[in-house]
Design a protein with these regions (language model features):
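Conserved helicase ATPase core
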Residues: 1-5, 76
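Conserved helicase motor core of SF1/SF2 NTP-dependent helicases
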Residues: 12-15, 23-224
Length: 224
């Protein structure tokens, strides 16, 4: 580090730097963004290289994706290593602060998301979303989630009716407003590929349309 300079780095590079460091805490401040994606040793590395630390993250986000089998993690007791931020939040004596005002969505969405945060979230603004007339009976004008129930046979990661329904909804949204940013998220890669094929056949390839797994797009902000 150089006095008065800002250094930006990934967890991977920083952890390697900390492992080889002979002089402790060369930085005045270390800020870890997306700290929920850091395993426990990364927090130790952060403390080693910085005199003061600020960890910014959400313990309710998905923990880091690891190669080890889930059963092995459980048997070997590695869960706390993988959920570093949650472990520290539950046991650390350091001051912890939660931001309660959301700028991403309206109050209806904040109420649903707030279930994970003791109903503490408040929306800065609550606009009405009425620019999608063909979806007015499905999507709420106040924003927030909508649950559409459909048959999904157990073990079938590419259910035909659900795939057709998703592509139909996407097509209607684009017909109403072609500039809307849309994300279609799934859990399984096989489901993602099936949806990508069905939606592309329906509306073509678009820069403002993303079909991917939840694990790959944490923190993404879109219209729908």
């Amino acid at each position: 580090p150089m006095p008065g300079c800002l250094v930006m780095s990934t967890y991977y590079i920083t952890s390697g730097y900390a492992a080889e460091l002979s002089v402790e805490q060369p930085f005045d401040y270390v800020i870890m963004d997306e700290a929920s994606q850091a395993i426990l040793p990364m927090f130790a590395a952060s403390r080693k290289i910085g005199k003061r630390n600020l960890w910014v993250g959400d313990i309710h986000q998905l923990s880091p994706i690891v190669i080890l089998n889930g059963n092995r993690i459980k048997i070997c007791g590695y869960k706390h290593l993988n959920e570093g931020l949650k472990l520290l939040a539950d046991n650390s004596t350091s001051p912890i602060y939660q931001l309660t005002k959301t700028y991403r969505f309206g109050q209806r969405a904040a109420n649903y998301t707030g279930v994970f945060y003791n109903d503490s979230l408040v929306a800065k603004e609550s606009p009405e979303y009425n620019e999608l007339p063909s979806m007015c009976k499905i999507l709420s004008i106040d924003g927030g989630p909508t649950l559409v129930l459909t048959d999904m046979p157990s073990g079938d990661s590419t259910p035909l009716f659900a795939t057709c329904m998703a592509s139909f909804i996407v097509a209607n949204i684009i017909n109403d407003n072609k500039d809307k940013e849309i994300a279609v998220l799934t859990c399984m890669k096989k489901t993602t590929r099936s949806l990508q094929m069905a939606i592309t056949q329906k509306v073509g390839t678009r820069k403002n349309l993303l079909v991917d797994t939840v694990a790959r797009v944490q923190g993404l902000t879109t219209d729908i």
